[in-house]
Amino acid sequence: MAQVVDGDTIRLTDGTMIRYIGVDTPEVRRREGTQWVSAPEPYGLEATEANRMLVADRTIRLEYDVETHDRYGRVLAYVYTDDGMVNAALIEQGYAAPMTIPPNVRHADMLRELGRAAREAQRGLWKDRER
């Protein structure tokens, strides 16, 4: 793993962009014309740091679902370290919301349940929000 781009995307050493399946984190930048500008949404920086803590200096493994690439050319994957699935950990910690986009639904039920528990416990981005 080379670089954490944001809370749900990493760039490998060969330049391949990996977008985590089943999660959505707050953005840290947005496009203005042809430029990317820093514009963190609430909890965007925290989600990026949580992702960094989960994958930095770790060997990762990728699990694919039905669709392997998104419309931007990024590889879609469930990302694993020796500690488990990063996608699930981000939701469990409250730094990501579950986001199901068929046909990539292999772990959707589990991710939704983790999201429900994080929301009820008001962890991370769910803090101070209505249950």
Task: Describe each region flagged by the PLM.
Residues 1-131:
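Small beta-barrel nucleic-acid-binding modules, primarily SNase/OB-fold domains
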